[in-house]
Structures are given as C-alpha cells and as structure tokens.
C-alpha cells in the first residue's frame, strides 16, 4: 500500500467514525445504494466544462458552442454520455420548448450518446422562505424536463457557492447549522418526492458551500432520508486535509459525479491523482457514468476541449490499470 493510500485509508476510517448514527439510526431510505455485478464505470462529460463557450453562444448564436456542439465533442472523443446542465438550454430557468427537447434527444440518440443528467441553480441555505420555495418549484420543473430528456438525475446545490465555506452563515441569517440543515432537508425531500413520481433522482452536490466535507454530505442525506435523493460527488469540493477520504465515504451514496482536475477546484490545490481516484471509486463498488467537469480557474488560456481530453485520458488509463 502506498503512503498516500495509507493516509487516505486512515482518514476514511476517521471520517467514517464521525458519522456512526447515519448507518445506525436512519430508515431504509437512507442506506448505501444496492449495486450488483461489481464495479463498472466510465468517464463521461459534464457540459459545464464548456461554460464560457456555451454562455457566448447563448448571447450570440454565431459564437462559442451550443449543446449540440458539446454532443459532437463527445462523439469525437468516444464519450458515452453527457450531463447537459440546465443553464445552457435556451430560455432557462423556464422549461425548454418540447421541440428543442425532442431535437436534442434525437441528436444524442442518433450518435449513441446518453443524456445522463442535468442541473439547476437553487438556494436552500437562505433564511428567505420565498427563495427556498422558488428553488423547490424550479427543481420540480427541471425534474419534469429531465424525465422528458430521459435523464435519470437532476443536480441541485445546498446553496450558492461561497468564497469561504463558512459564509453560508450570513445567507442563513445567523441560524444554527442544525436549523439550516432541517429546512434544507425539508425542501430537498419535497423535491425528491416529486422526483420519484417521474423516475428522476435528486442529486445533492458538495459545492464548497454548506456541504464541504463528507460527514456534512452524509448528515444532510440522512436527514432528507428519501430513496429518490442521493449524492453528486464533486471530487474538487471537499475542503479537507484529505479529500480522497471524503470521496471514499460518499461512493456508496453516489448517484452522479463531477471529476475535477484539481482537488480544491483551484490551481493552488494539488492535481487530482486519477489512479487514486479510480481505485476509490472501484473499491466502493460504483457502477455507472463518472462525468468530468473541468474549470477555467482564472486561466485566460483555458482550453476546455484540451482540458477535458487530458482528464479523460488520465481517467481511462487509471481505470484500465485496475484490470
């Protein structure tokens, strides 16, 4: 066992010890996902990697790239699935026209690409009940959009991303963490209940906000306690001394992923060790798509196509080495 692996294992055991009640007292709704057949996963794409180009196209259709262009990128690189972030659909936050949904569904199908998910912008951290209610309404709407697309997952946030993970306290109006988690869980449970009616899972992302550690992620999911709610594991947003340990704790609850090129979504943090990450995902028994989401991180020369291809190569090689 390598030194890094040994450290991660020790921290995994430490983090697991912090959440004993999650395993001991919750209902059957909150439990490790029952997967059969052994681990089997492949790196895919989250469209957000092309953020700047997609936004440019929304502002001026003659510029940048649209979602159809993102699908073409998947074809070029033999990527089997794409997570089509809601923000990049025309008219967001409104539901796209049926004609547009039908076009993108047919376009992906004809090219052998699966639409693996979508996502919205919401704020369930705020003390403002009206804003939370708007987030529930938005999430429910996009659950229905996801169902139309044939996408099994809608990604949601705990709240808006903060420069400092502790800044959520300001948005929460001074409420305690327990109180915020309660009202957040109430909102997410309502969304998950709606998701169950449409066969769409609500995936809560750790986004460097209210959810910045594995134990925080587990605690919220336990409180939501709904079979149609799970974790979107963002490998670049567990702000701890050993993010790999947090990732390992979350694999049994993962319903979607965002694989980042660095561990802290910043050029100041270590590059992701894809071999370590792949082994953690494998050892956790995960089956399914593992979308890559790269970030500009302030780089003026950021090339999303090249960055995604770099991470894709690293993940594919790491997975192949597991055999």
Q: What annotation goes with each model-predicted range?
A:
Residues 275, 282, 289-293:
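H/E-rich (His + Asp/Glu) clusters that bind or coordinate divalent metals
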């Amino acid at each position: 066992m390598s030194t890094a692996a040994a450290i991660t294992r020790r921290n995994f055991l430490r983090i697991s010890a912090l959440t004993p009640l999650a395993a001991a007292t919750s209902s059957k709704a909150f439990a490790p996902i029952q997967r059969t057949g052994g681990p089997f996963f492949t790196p895919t794409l989250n469209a957000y990697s092309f953020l700047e180009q997609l936004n440019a196209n929304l502002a001026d259709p003659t510029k940048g790239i649209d979602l159809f262009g993102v699908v073409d990128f998947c074809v070029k690189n033999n990527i089997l699935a794409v997570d089509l972030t809601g923000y990049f659909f025309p008219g967001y936050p409104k539901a796209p026209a049926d004609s547009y949904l039908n076009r993108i569904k047919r376009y992906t199908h004809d090219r052998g690409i699966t639409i693996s998910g979508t996502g919205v912008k919401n704020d369930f951290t705020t003390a403002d009940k009206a804003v939370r209610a708007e987030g529930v309404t938005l999430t429910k709407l996009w659950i229905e959009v996801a169902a139309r697309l044939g996408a099994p997952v809608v990604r949601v946030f705990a709240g808006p991303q903060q420069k400092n993970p502790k800044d959520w306290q300001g948005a929460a109006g001074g409420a305690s963490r327990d109180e915020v988690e309660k009202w957040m869980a109430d909102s997410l449970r309502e969304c998950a209940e709606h998701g169950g009616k449409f066969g769409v899972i609500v995936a809560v992302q750790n986004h460097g906000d209210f959810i910045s550690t594995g134990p925080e992620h587990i605690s919220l999911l336990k409180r939501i306690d709904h079979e149609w709610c799970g974790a979107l594991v963002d490998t670049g947003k567990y702000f701890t001394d050993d993010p790999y340990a947090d990732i390992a704790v979350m694999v049994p609850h993962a319903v979607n992923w965002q694989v980042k090129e660095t561990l802290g979504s910043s050029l100041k943090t270590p590059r992701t060790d894809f071999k370590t990450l792949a082994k953690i995902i494998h050892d956790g028994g995960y089956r399914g798509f593992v979308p890559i989401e790269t970030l500009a991180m302030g780089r003026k020369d950021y090339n999303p196509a090249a960055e995604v291809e770099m991470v894709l190569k690293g993940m594919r090689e790491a997975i192949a080495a597991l055999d």
